[in-house]
Structures are given as C-alpha cells and as structure tokens.
C-alpha cells in the first residue's frame, strides 16, 4: 500500500516497525529518525499507522492494518479490550508483559532516580495474568435511556464502556457490580453529569 508523499502530518499513513514499549504500554517505533507511539501494538509488530497527533520529533498514531504480527501478541481475554481504557496490556503475552514492566521500572530508576545499577526483584504476577486487581474504581454514568452504567472510559475520552465483569479484577467482585448498578437504578440516586454539573454519585 502506498503512503502519502509528505507523510509527517496529521492524517498521513506510514509503515512502522514496533521496537519497544512505553511506560503506558504504547508501542514505540521510528520513522526517519522520529518517534511514533502506537497504542495496541507490541514489540515485533509491523503496522500501517495513521498519524493522529504530530509534533516535530514525535507523533501518535492509530493502527490501520497489522502487517506483521509479533510473537508476543495474543488475543485479549476481554471482549471490549479494543475500546476500554481500563488496561493496556491484554494483547501482550504474560512473560513479555513482565519483561516490559521490569524495564519500565529500571528505566525510571536510572533516568529519573539517577541510580546506576539498581537491584530490582522480579515482577510478580498471577499465574494467568488475570483476576489480580483487588481494588477498582468505576466511573458512573447514565445511558441515553437513563440506565445506570459503570465501567471504564474509552481510550482517550470520557465516554463510558459499560461493564458487568472485568477479567483482570478479582472475579468475586463481578456479582457486586451488577447488583450495585441495579440498586442505584431502583433507588433513583443522582449520577453526576459532567455536562450539566449535576448529581452526586461519580464513582463506584
């Protein structure tokens, strides 16, 4: 597929090989010496990217097509992983997640903390990489039909992805989520409305 003749501008298409991950789990690639951050990618991916925010030396892009899939890429366990902003690592296999998170800590200690060779214990995780969150905070909203919704915001927005369960939280919390939403609905409690500045309940 042909890319634009002047590709370093918003809306242009470029091909990028992902060579690293940022501390936010965005894929990091380079194009003619400039850095490109691409969410939902992993080291080893080669992707066709549309630039959505462009600065002189770096840009953010959105994947338009996966050209080559990384061996670290897996199918997310969550059915709304491509929309939900609650976690950024679900498309990455657990072993590489641990490796990448370890590197994030090391980079922070060295570059920000000034430590030359800090001792870091291995990253610990659940055996499956799921059901490990024991504390969650869900924003609350009402749908256009007036139904109580709770979940996480869509990536880069305050539009809610309504959830009844989440594969990274402790599964014992799932029944409470649906029940509490039902209780709020039945009691008619006021959900905070960002546009109007009304209502009291903002988070669950």
PLM regions and their residue ranges:
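Accessory RNA-recognition modules of RNA-modification enzymes
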Residues: 1-204
């Amino acid at each position: 597929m042909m890319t634009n003749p002047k590709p370093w501008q918003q809306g242009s298409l470029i091909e990028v090989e992902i060579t690293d991950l940022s501390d936010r789990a965005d894929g990091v690639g380079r194009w003619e010496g400039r850095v490109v951050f691409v969410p939902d990618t992993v080291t080893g991916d080669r992707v066709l990217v549309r630039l959505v925010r462009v600065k002189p030396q770096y840009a953010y892009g959105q994947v338009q097509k996966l050209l080559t899939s990384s061996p670290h890429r897996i199918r997310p366990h969550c059915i709304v992983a491509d929309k939900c902003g609650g976690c950024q690592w679900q498309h990455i296999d657990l072993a590489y997640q641990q490796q990448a998170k370890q590197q994030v800590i090391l980079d922070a200690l060295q570059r920000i903390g000034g430590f030359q060779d800090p001792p870091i214990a291995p990253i610990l995780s659940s055996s499956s990489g799921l059901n490990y969150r024991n504390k969650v905070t869900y924003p609350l909203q009402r749908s256009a039909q007036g139904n109580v919704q709770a979940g996480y915001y869509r990536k880069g927005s305050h539009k809610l992805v309504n959830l009844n369960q989440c594969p990274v939280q402790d599964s014992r919390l799932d029944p409470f989520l649906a029940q509490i939403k039902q209780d709020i609905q039945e009691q008619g409690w006021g959900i905070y409305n960002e546009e109007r500045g009304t209502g009291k309940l903002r988070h669950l």
